[in-house]
């Protein structure tokens, strides 16, 4: 194998975009979001994402970035909350990502109308897992992605799985080396 297969930055960037941004990845177990208003935040792929089970029981994912000034909205890995407030200027969002509180909103003179929502990412709950695609404006086709593997996932009974331990291993290498 040619060494450029592992060292070419342009190739790496294309692979990273395709594999880790435009592909559905497991964000968490369904049991990590056991009831309405529970959330799980992560930024394993250098994009901060928060997955929220809404008051309606629906799972949604958003960039964990305040649309006002780009600060993190959710600062803890997991928990329960019916609203999320950015520490920077106090913008507050509900479990659907909609802004429900913007301090001194009138002073913006309507210039923030397009920023009154957290940026959504495609998310879907299946087989006891929550899948998220880290490309906000993309379309996630989970059935095509999983194919026949979906039936295999069902047989694992992951809907009842409980997280026992979290371990993180950080390796500075091309993703192909770690596989």
Each model region followed by its residue ranges:
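Glycine-rich active-site/cofactor-binding loop and its immediate structural neighborhood
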Residues: 38-87
């Amino acid at each position: 194998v040619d060494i450029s297969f592992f060292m070419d930055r342009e190739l790496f960037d294309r692979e990273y975009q395709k594999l880790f941004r435009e592909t559905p990845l497991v964000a968490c177990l369904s049991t990590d979001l056991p009831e309405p208003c529970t959330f799980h935040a992560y930024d394993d792929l250098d994009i901060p994402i928060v997955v929220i089970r809404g008051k309606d029981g629906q799972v949604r994912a958003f960039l964990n970035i305040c649309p006002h000034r780009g600060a993190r909205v959710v600062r803890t890995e997991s928990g329960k909350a019916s609203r999320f407030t950015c520490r920077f200027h106090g913008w507050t969002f509900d479990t659907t990502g909609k802004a429900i509180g913007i301090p001194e909103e009138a002073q913006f003179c309507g210039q923030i109308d397009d920023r009154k929502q957290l940026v959504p990412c495609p998310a879907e709950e299946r087989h006891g897992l929550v899948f998220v695609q880290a490309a906000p404006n993309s379309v996630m086709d989970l059935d095509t992605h999983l194919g026949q593997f979906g039936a295999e996932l069902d047989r694992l009974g992951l809907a009842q799985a409980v997280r026992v331990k979290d371990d993180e291993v950080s390796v500075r290498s091309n993703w192909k080396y770690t596989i």
